[in-house]
């Protein structure tokens, strides 16, 4: 079933350890695209070269993964612990993307039930989306 749709979806997924969450998010995005949604998949983990891109736009935030001390040990792509400035930069990039896309639908994978360490960007994103003028 394919239909034309003018609605857009911004789907945020953060993989920190493995890539199962981003693979499943990619499948959901493919299905949304297949029924006509304009889909932007925003990923914040290490880049994955072989994600299915047909019909969706993939936006890579500055990569983040966990260090040896567990899920509270957030590291950048050089394995350096992230600091407040790094988090502000990434949050601002995500909010800028949201403003540029102005999606009709926002999906956050796992949050607030998981990915609590991503509060620094997801709570501002949700607050920003809630404050936006809607028809």
Residues covered by each model-derived region:
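Conserved nucleotide-sugar phosphate-binding/catalytic loop shared by glycosyltransferases and other
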Residues: 6, 11, 15, 31-84
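Short beta-strands and strand-loop turn motifs
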Residues: 12, 107-110, 135
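A short, glycine/small-residue-rich beta-strand->loop->alpha-helix junction that serves as a flexible
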Residues: 13-24
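Short amphipathic alpha-helix
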Residues: 22-32
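Conserved strand-to-helix beginnings and helix N-cap segments that scaffold or border functional pockets
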Residues: 22-23, 118-122
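A general structural detector for well-ordered alpha-helical segments in enzyme core domains, enriched
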Residues: 28, 94, 121-125
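Conserved nucleotide-sugar donor-binding subdomain of glycosyltransferases
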Residues: 76-119
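Active-site-proximal region of nucleotide-activated glycan assembly enzymes
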Residues: 120-135
């Amino acid at each position: 079933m394919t239909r034309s749709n003018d609605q857009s979806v911004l789907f945020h997924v953060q993989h920190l350890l493995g890539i199962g969450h981003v693979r499943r998010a990619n499948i959901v995005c493919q299905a949304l695209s297949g029924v006509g949604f304009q889909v932007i998949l925003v990923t914040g983990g290490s880049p994955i070269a072989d994600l299915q891109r047909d019909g969706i736009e993939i936006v890579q935030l500055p990569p983040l993964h966990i260090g040896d001390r567990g899920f509270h040990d957030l590291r950048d792509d050089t394995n350096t612990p992230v600091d407040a400035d790094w988090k502000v930069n990434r949050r601002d990039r995500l909010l800028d993307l949201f403003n540029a896309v102005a999606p009709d639908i926002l999906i956050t994978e796992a949050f607030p039930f998981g990915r609590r360490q991503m509060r620094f960007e997801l709570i501002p994103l949700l607050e920003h989306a809630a404050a936006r003028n809607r028809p």
